[in-house]
């Protein structure tokens, strides 16, 4: 028998120390990684329930194990809520992550050697959209589209390449693109060449749910996403699809790619979707956009170039070359000053992928902890102050002290 009061603190002090240290880091640092956020206590509680004990291969009402009547309720709640949130005809909430969701789409519609077309990783795409080292680039003939001279998606070139290569699948979506994506135009091109149209909305899902970024669901055959990032849920994936594709997608997830779903995570997804359906979620996403705009404008005023000329979303790419520092070094020195960020390639980057000439900045996490325009502006000024003298130990210490004072006023978990 287990005693409920016997927790990690008593049973595994080494691990507990690491968890406590991470808790302290999250509270003390300004989180600027665009793909990270803070899940609510309710989401984390659901993920820590006894649902983790239950095997439930299959789908609600059609399981290969007994005793699934209660986890069926949890999964059906998640399905119904995510369909309502995005206006989808059908949904699968079982993917363990965004990459698994994308792989399921490939399994449902493609054969090895088929041609797929996605955004170039070097110009803002994602590795699961055809990168040569990824399964998507190894198993399929991957062709890519990119940006024009203004660092906007080159829709004309994309259309020409689609007609020239006749891909079986066209993917829209990105991991480092700050502007709106014209999903209707992609859909028309896919229709013209007879391709399945897939959208990976992982980065933009929270904004889309709030009606503040174009919704791909009316245009795409299939839409994939993560459930964390701007959605503020647990780490996991979802697939939204037209009703006509429901059977193919469900079969691709189980038994195609996965066995037992993570029912505790699915329960946490249901909580997150319910939170996103509340009026306060739109207010949160509106503030995410306001903070991103102020942050980008302030950095630009301090001499840093924002790729694509600005942002229409929660994130931005910052070109660091004017400061004579690489993304790798900037990530390290900003981290030393308690600002967590990630290095990121910029379009036509002369540096290696693990070095880069830029960083990617996002505002979802800072907004969750209560930052508004004033704090976003202060954060941008602190970033610029540090990058003006990135190798000055006294400057790093001074910026770190200001960061610590700022985060102390805005705890993540009160």
Curated annotation (Swiss-Prot):
Domain of life: Bacteria
Coiled-coil regions, chain positions: none
Physiological role: Catalyzes the reversible interconversion of serine and glycine with tetrahydrofolate (THF) serving as the one-carbon carrier. This reaction serves as the major source of one-carbon groups required for the biosynthesis of purines, thymidylate, methionine, and other important biomolecules. Also exhibits THF-independent aldolase activity toward beta-hydroxyamino acids, producing glycine and aldehydes, via a retro-aldol mechanism.
Pfam families xrefs: SHMT (PF00464)
Keywords in alphabetical order: Amino-acid biosynthesis, Cytoplasm, One-carbon metabolism, Pyridoxal phosphate, Transferase
E.C. code: 2.1.2.1
Protein name: Serine hydroxymethyltransferase
Reactions listed under catalytic activity: (6R)-5,10-methylene-5,6,7,8-tetrahydrofolate + glycine + H2O = (6S)-5,6,7,8-tetrahydrofolate + L-serine
Residue positions, PTM N6-(pyridoxal phosphate)lysine: 229
Assembly description: Homodimer.
Cofactor: pyridoxal 5'-phosphate
Species assigned in the record: Verminephrobacter eiseniae (strain EF01-2)
